Every structure is written in structure tokens, then in C-alpha cells.
């Protein structure tokens, strides 16, 4: 005797394939389950993700929220004294332009902060107001 709890869905391999276009009594005859006219009836049609039948989709009906300030933010980069030792010679001038030319900073960078890490062996000339020195670097420069 078969009990309800033992019934199972046939696995995809055993499931009967849908025969299309084989007469009206099959349930999938004539238009082969595609309906009459419209995008879905055409060959090669795939419904786009989020498509809602021509109406304005949900992702366009819902208002956008918030504001990103990223476009307008000033780009600030950090450089260590250790790195400056390897890039500049003694008595050289340090400015945003020289840092950009030597590809130390990105070309869109508008400010640089110099951080104390290791010793600064060379005496450098700080030209640009956009280059900010940390307290540790300021005290190091005064001692040199």
C-alpha cells in the first residue's frame, strides 16, 4: 500500500519533458506555451532582470537615498620620512609637483601628509603649503 508520506517528486531525469507544438489537446500546441504576440513570443527572447512587463520597474520607482561626497572630497595621501629618504637628495625641494613627477603620489592628490617613520637623513626644502608635516617630523627637522 502507498502512503502519502512516501510520495516523492520525480527527479529531473524521470520527469516527462514538455512536448511543444503537438496539437491542441497536449496543452502546449499551436503557440507552444508562448502566448500570442509580444516580446515573449519571439525567438531568442530572454527577459531582462528586473523587467516588469513594460511598467516602470521597482528599482526606478524607489527614490534614491543619501549623498556621496566622494566626488568633491580632497584627495590626501600619506608619505613616510623613510620613503622620502630614498626619493630625494640632500637640499632638494619637495613640492606636490616634484612628488607627482616622480610618481610618488597620484596625479589627483591635492594634499600630502608626511609621517615620521624611520630617520630623515637629508635636509630637504619644503616648498608647498599643501604638504603638511606631522608633529614628529617637525621636531625631527628642527633637530637636523
Swiss-Prot record:
Renumbered residue ranges of the record's region Disordered: 1-48
Highest taxon, organism lineage: Bacteria
This protein's UniProt keywords: Ribonucleoprotein, Ribosomal protein, RNA-binding, rRNA-binding
GO molecular function: rRNA binding; structural constituent of ribosome
Any GO BP annotation: translation
Keyword tRNA-binding included in the entry's annotation: no
Entry-linked InterPro entries: Ribosomal_uL15, Ribosomal_uL15/eL18_sf, Ribosomal_uL15_bac-type
GO CC, one annotated term: cytosolic large ribosomal subunit
SUPFAM superfamilies, alphabetized: Ribosomal proteins L15p and L18e
Known partners and oligomeric status: Part of the 50S ribosomal subunit.
Similarity annotation: Belongs to the universal ribosomal protein uL15 family.
Function (record text): Binds to the 23S rRNA.
Name of the protein in question: Large ribosomal subunit protein uL15
Amino acid at each position: 500500500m502507498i502512503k502519502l508520506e512516501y510520495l516523492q517528486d520525480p527527479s529531473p531525469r524521470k520527469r516527462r519533458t514538455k512536448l511543444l507544438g503537438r496539437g491542441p489537446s497536449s496543452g502546449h500546441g499551436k503557440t507552444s506555451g508562448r502566448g500570442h504576440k509580444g516580446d515573449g513570443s519571439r525567438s531568442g527572447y530572454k527577459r531582462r532582470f528586473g523587467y516588469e512587463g513594460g511598467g516602470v520597474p521597482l528599482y526606478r520607482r524607489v527614490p534614491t537615498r543619501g549623498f556621496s561626497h566622494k566626488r568633491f572630497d580632497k584627495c590626501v595621501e600619506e608619505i613616510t620620512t623613510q620613503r622620502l629618504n630614498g626619493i630625494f637628495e640632500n637640499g632638494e625641494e619637495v613640492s606636490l609637483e616634484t612628488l607627482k613627477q616622480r610618481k610618488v603620489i597620484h596625479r589627483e592628490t591635492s594634499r600630502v601628509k608626511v609621517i615620521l617613520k624611520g630617520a630623515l637623513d637629508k635636509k630637504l626644502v619644503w616648498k608647498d603649503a599643501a604638504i603638511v608635516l606631522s608633529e614628529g617630523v617637525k621636531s625631527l627637522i628642527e633637530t637636523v
